[in-house]
Amino acid sequence: MTVARLRELLPDYARDLRLNLGSVTSQSNLSAQQLWGTVLAAAIASRGRTVLVELEPEALDHLSAEAATAARTAAALMAMNNVYYRSLHLLEDEEYSRLRAGLRMNALANPGVDKVDVELWSLAVSAVNGCGRCLTAHEHELRGRGVAREVIQDAIRVASVVHAVAVTVEALETSSGTNRVAAAD
């Protein structure tokens, strides 16, 4: 199961996504670990079963066990943080920001891989989940660690394409296209 297989599942109306998926996974300013950790974290965050089934094995071919665990951890913890911090932002009451969050995130303290990579994966998941406060925080941390804007942009590009592919494939599976996707298996 590969990027190529997932690209084959995309219908003609999603040709741009097909091309974008190929380009973001082959031409990047990200290291291989950063790229495939971003792919894995974004696939998890996108909640698309088929997308995760198709992309995870290829991602695991490029990631150490520690990196795969760190990408999964980033996806899991950002699922929590993105809801929490996006909600605080939307409430528009700064008093909530002064309250202790009380949410455990110990796994991010020692992720077993370079913290820049985990920040990129957290940024990508935050992009998928639409948390502006988290995006700003992760971008600020990455820029403070000397990460170029082009690298940050590539992580966001990967996340946006993976998410769009997940939405498109899920729509196919839900609509009359279900048989078409299932038949491709």
Swiss-Prot record:
**Function recorded in the entry:** Antioxidant protein with alkyl hydroperoxidase activity. Required for the reduction of the AhpC active site cysteine residues and for the regeneration of the AhpC enzyme activity.
Cite the InterPro entries for this sequence: AhpD (IPR004674), AhpD-like (IPR029032), AhpD_core (IPR004675), CMD-like (IPR003779)
Q: Which reaction does it catalyse?
A: N(6)-[(R)-dihydrolipoyl]-L-lysyl-[lipoyl-carrier protein] + a hydroperoxide = N(6)-[(R)-lipoyl]-L-lysyl-[lipoyl-carrier protein] + an alcohol + H2O
Which positions are catalytic residues? C131 (proton donor), C134 (cysteine sulfenic acid (-soh) intermediate)
From the Swiss-Prot or TrEMBL record, give the protein name. Answer: Alkyl hydroperoxide reductase AhpD
Q: Which GO terms describe its biological process?
A: cell redox homeostasis; response to oxidative stress
Similarity annotation:
Belongs to the AhpD family.
Question: What terms describe the molecular function in GO for this protein?
Answer: alkyl hydroperoxide reductase activity; disulfide oxidoreductase activity; hydroperoxide reductase activity; peroxiredoxin activity
* Species this chain originates from: Frankia alni (strain DSM 45986 / CECT 9034 / ACN14a)
Assembly and interaction partners: Homotrimer.
Q: List the disulfide bonds.
A: C131-C134
Which gene is annotated as encoding this protein in its UniProt record?
Answer: ahpD
Q: Name one Pfam family in it.
A: CMD
- Which keywords belong to this entry? Antioxidant, Disulfide bond, Oxidoreductase, Peroxidase, Redox-active center
Q: Which SUPFAM superfamilies match?
A: AhpD-like (SSF69118)
| Top-level EC class | oxidoreductase
**Which top-rank group of organisms is this from?**
Bacteria
Its EC number is 1.11.1.28
